[in-house]
Amino acid sequence: MYSYIRGVLTEKNEDGVVVDCHGLGFDLQMGPQLAARLGEIGTELTVYTHFHITQDSQKLYAFPDKESRKLFRMLISVSGIGPKVAMSVLEDFEPAEFALHVLKKDTKALTKVKGLGKKSAEQIGRAHV
């Protein structure tokens, strides 16, 4: 639906950020570690997005780069991993670092992510490596 949003960072909160794009404020889901990479309030920026629809909600997730969005999409394609766990992965690891742990089958490092158990970590390796 939306590939990216370019605008001005107007707010950071516990759930994400708000980006003003020509007078329209987009409420974007993003963890605090990722949000910190965006800069200060008032910064002009581009964020890459993923629109996620469930039976109960519609949320627009934002990422500072395409690689983070790609990892998020890969993770939510794995059975049992939802957006919350995928965002936790992105809070704890850079995409390249996470990929290295998956390639090494380093489940000890992967299971340090909140909500990611051994079974899910192994499933990621089987599904996408």
Range-by-range predicted roles:
Residues 127-129:
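Conserved small/polar residues in nucleotide/adenosyl-binding loops
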Residues 1-77:
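Structure-specific DNA junction-binding interface
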